[in-house]
């Protein structure tokens, strides 16, 4: 749910031409929207992998790490949007909070996976639903 909430909020804010002028549509806005969707895609792909298989576990760790990197990149774009005057400080704080919640959940999930690699059942996480 958290990823979905982040994507919905990201699209709601960035689709407003009152906030983000059209001249930034194909530069900043598209990158912001793509990062939010990329976070979801990485978590979904990682969640589909089986921890019982070593190669899938390694791939899952890589996807989780990539999702964390995308969270950091999205946070940068959110901050940049505020600094450029496209969003208020209050909007920046709320949007950042959503992104940070996702980031912390992915980090905790990644850490938990490291301690669960020896169990026989694959771990599924509700972050992406």
Label the predicted regions.
Residues 1-116, 120:
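Amphipathic alpha-helical assembly/interaction segments
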Residues 117-129:
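Single conserved hydrophobic/aromatic residue that forms the stacking wall/gate
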